[in-house]
Curated annotation (Swiss-Prot):
Subunit details: Homodecamer; pentamer of dimers.
Keyword Hydrolase: no
Pfam families (UniProt xref): Pantoate_transf
UniProt binding sites for 3-methyl-2-oxobutanoate: 46-47, 85, 115
Stated role: Catalyzes the reversible reaction in which hydroxymethyl group from 5,10-methylenetetrahydrofolate is transferred onto alpha-ketoisovalerate to form ketopantoate.
GO BP: any one term: pantothenate biosynthetic process
Gene3D superfamilies xref list: Phosphoenolpyruvate-binding domains
Gene that encodes the chain: panB
Top-level taxon of the source organism: Bacteria
Pathway named in the protein's UniProt entry: Cofactor biosynthesis; (R)-pantothenate biosynthesis; (R)-pantoate from 3-methyl-2-oxobutanoate: step 1/2
Protein name per the record: 3-methyl-2-oxobutanoate hydroxymethyltransferase
Cofactor remark: Binds 1 Mg(2+) ion per subunit.
UniProt lineage: Bacteria, Bacillati, Actinomycetota, Actinomycetes, Mycobacteriales
Binding site for Mg(2+): 46, 85, 117
NCBIfam families: panB (TIGR00222), PRK00311.1 (NF001452)
Amino acid sequence: MTRPVRLQDLRDYKKNNRPWAMLTTYDYSTTRAFVDAGIEVFLVGDSAANTMLGYSGTNQVSFEEMVMLTAAVVRGAGPAMVVADLPFGTYEASDEQAVRSATEMVRRTGAHVVKLEGGVRMASRIRAITDAGVPVCAHLGFTPQSMNQLSGFKVQRGAEKLTADVDAVVEAGAEMVVFEMVPADLAAELTARCPIPVIGIGAGNATDAQVLVWHDIANLPKGDHRARFVKTYAEVGSQLTCAARFYRKDVEARRFPAEEHTF
């Protein structure tokens, strides 16, 4: 798509049963590569805490770090849509805090949508942000920022609770919603009745879209544990290690720089 991707495009994709792919990305150069691959929607996730910054959990990434990463992605995204996570601690306290964080994220980065975790309990935050003119993506099911309350990584099976959460975020004005680690049959049922696009991660293949962390599809770093819902499409970790090793050996043997690399 040469013109900017719009929220109406995603609604049309849902109406026409056209699935679409979202990827996380955190920097300019990687984003450019994914634009060339035809990815139309990017998520600058708080997963950057682990994948890019080396923190032990997503709750450790700061607002300023997310602003820096998101701005870089927007500069590389071209016509693609960019969704930015609001990190833990930047929206939970009050509607006013949520609006400040969301508007600041959009103003400073150019992101098109902000994402936050929670359903019924965050409905007023979603409504306040939406009323302030910022589109919202909700995140339901397994919510990593609340992992301590959820007792770790577990599939979220509560149909009644998830249904109530979906209804709440839709009523609050969310433009899209992520289902994480939700049983496939439940995700399919809720996707069919949900009027906004549903993005799945570990939620079966009946959702309107799929999202994965790009490091997972590329097996980077090599050997890291991958969740069951991940499919590896390339061995980028191994390729990077090989490239760096060959470079090091060439330097040590004075094979690089060769004559063709010298002025």
